[in-house]
From Swiss-Prot:
This is ATP synthase subunit delta. It is a peripheral membrane protein. Belongs to the ATPase delta chain family. InterPro entries: ATP_synth_OSCP/delta_N_sf (IPR026015), ATPase_OSCP/dsu (IPR000711). Its main location: membrane. PANTHER family: ATP SYNTHASE DELTA CHAIN (PTHR11910). It is found in: Cell inner membrane. GO terms for cellular component: plasma membrane; proton-transporting ATP synthase complex. F-type ATPases have 2 components, F(1) - the catalytic core - and F(0) - the membrane proton channel. F(1) has five subunits: alpha(3), beta(3), gamma(1), delta(1), epsilon(1). F(0) has three main subunits: a(1), b(2) and c(10-14). The alpha and beta chains form an alternating ring which encloses part of the gamma chain. F(1) is attached to F(0) by a central stalk formed by the gamma and epsilon chains, while a peripheral stalk is formed by the delta and b chains.
Length: 180
């Protein structure tokens, strides 16, 4: 994981720089394209083709580009060819993640992972996200998961910060206090 992140970082930073300076579209359109590229590269069939040494690079790039549904500009085509030429197409999912982090940093926003013991309804989720935005002082994009093992409450992760108000964590804290 760390090795993949190290390999992907310069590509993500270069692509972000190109996207920021490009007149071919806004950062949102680039973000959607890069996310799609990451999803396609993560596909097991595409991984198998990318890992096959018998597939020529130009054919691999052509195949990859043909699978994408988003409109492509010349910069994106050259980027894919660069990845293929350097044998780094399989790193595209990590490049997409790092591109997204760079975009969020530019916009002053973050992703938030909310894990709840029960499904959150629309107003509950909106109120929770609004409270978290006030706490963290930036726009948050929520990804919600349900984990019944929490028993009750929620666990929130924004970047490297974790707020765990679940019943499970409170019980674990009580157990630690009682056994100490």
């Amino acid at each position: 994981m760390a090795e993949t992140a190290t390999i992907a970082r310069p590509y993500a930073e270069a692509l972000f720089r190109v996207a920021s300076e490009s007149s071919a579209g806004n950062l949102g359109a680039w973000s959607e394209l890069v996310s799609e590229m990451g999803q396609v590269a993560a596909n097991p069939d595409m991984k198998a083709v990318a890992g096959d040494p018998n597939v020529p690079g130009d054919k691999l790039a052509e195949l990859f580009l043909s699978v994408l549904k988003s409109p492509l500009n010349d910069e994106a085509r050259r980027f894919v060819k660069l990845l293929v030429d350097n044998g780094r197409l399989t790193v595209m999912p990590e490049i997409a993640e790092q591109f997204h982090v760079l975009k969020n940093a530019r916009e002053g926003s973050s992703d938030v992972e909310i894990t709840s013991a029960f499904p959150l309804e629309g107003s509950q989720l909106n109120d929770l996200v609004a409270a978290l935005e006030r706490k963290f002082g930036r726009k948050l994009y929520a990804q919600v998961a349900v984990d019944p093992s929490l028993i009750g409450g929620v666990s929130v992760k924004v970047g490297d910060e974790v707020l765990d108000t679940s019943v499970r964590s409170r019980l674990a804290a009580m157990q630690a206090t009682l056994t100490a």
